[in-house]
Amino acid sequence: MSQSSLNMPGSHDPVALEAMRVRLQGRRRFKNAIALTMSLAAMAFGLVWLIWILYTTLRLGVGGLSIELFTQSTPPPNTDGGGLANAIVGSLMLVGLATFIGTPIGILAGVYLAEYGQKGWLASITRFINDILLSAPSIVVGLFVYALVVAKMGHFSGWAGVFALALLQIPIVIRTTENMLKLVPNALREAAFALGTPKWKMVLSITLKASVAGIVTGVLLGVARIAGETAPLLFTALSNQFFSMNMGQPVANLPVTIYKFAMSPFAQWQSLAWAGVFLITLAVLGLNILARTIFSNK
C-alpha cells in the first residue's frame, strides 16, 4: 500500500469503506439494469413483429384451408373454387429434386474440405466460393441460371428451377458438413489409423457416422431455405395454371403462385395466396423444429 493511501483520511474508516462499496454496487446495478432493459427491448421488438406475422398468417391462412385446396388446380381469374394442388405438387418436385442433387454434392464437398483438402489451395478456393454463394441474394442465383440455362434453352423449365434451388442449398450442406466433421475428436481418427484402417473407410465408418445428426440438420435447414424461395423460380421454372409433371416445361409452384395471386385484385386468388403462405410457413417451421430436435438429441 502506498504512503498516500495510508495518509488518506478515512482510509481505515469502516463506515467510509462501506459507503464506497454501496456506491460502487449502486453504479453496477444501474449499468446492469440499463443493459438488461435494452436487451429485453431489442428482444421484444423482434418478437412483436414475428408474432404479428405468424398471427396474420394464421388468421388469414386458415380461412382458405379446405379439401379443394389439396385436390384442385389453381382457378382462372375471378372464379369461385379452385385450389393449389398443382402448385403444391410442383413445389414438392422442385424441392425434392434439388435436395436429391444438392445433398450428395454438398456432403462430398464438405468431406473433402474437412478430411482431405484442409489447408490446400483448392480447399481455400472452394471455401471462398462457398462463402460467396452463402451470402449471395437468391435473385442473383436466379439470374445466373436464367442466363446459363433458360436463355440457352429458349424457354422456362422445371429443371432450371431445380438447378437454381440446388445452387442455394449446396453451400449450406457444405458448411454444415465441414463444421460437423471438424467437431469429431482427432483421437478417433488416430485410433482408426493405428489399427490400419484406410482413410476412406475411417471417414465412412467413423467421422461421418459420428456427425450424421449434424449433417441431417444441415440438409433440413437447406430444404427449409429453398422451400419458400420465389426470386430464383421467377427466372427459371416460372409457373402455370395446370397440373403438369413435365420438368422440361414451366412448372407450377407455391412461391410464384402466392406472389401472382397476392398481387391480383381477385378475392379468391388472395384467399388462396394466404392459404399457400400458411402452408409454406408451417412447413418451414416444422423443418426447423425437426432439425433442432435431431441435433439436440444427438
Positions of PLM-derived features:
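Transmembrane alpha-helical segments of polytopic membrane transport and secretion proteins
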Residues: 1-45, 291-298
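Periplasmic/extracellular loop-to-transmembrane helix junction in inner-membrane transport proteins
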Residues: 18-41, 55-98, 119, 257-271
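Interhelical loop and adjacent transmembrane-helix boundary motif
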Residues: 77-78, 233-281
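Transmembrane-helix boundary motif in ABC transporter permease subunits
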Residues: 98-130, 143, 291-296
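Transmembrane alpha-helices
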Residues: 99, 176-177, 199-235
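C-terminal transmembrane helix and the adjacent membrane-cytosol boundary/short C-terminal tail
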Residues: 113, 178, 182, 193, ...
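Amphipathic cytosolic juxtamembrane alpha-helices at the membrane-cytosol interface
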Residues: 118-123, 127, 185, 189-217
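Generic hydrophobic transmembrane alpha-helix motif, especially the helices
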Residues: 130-169
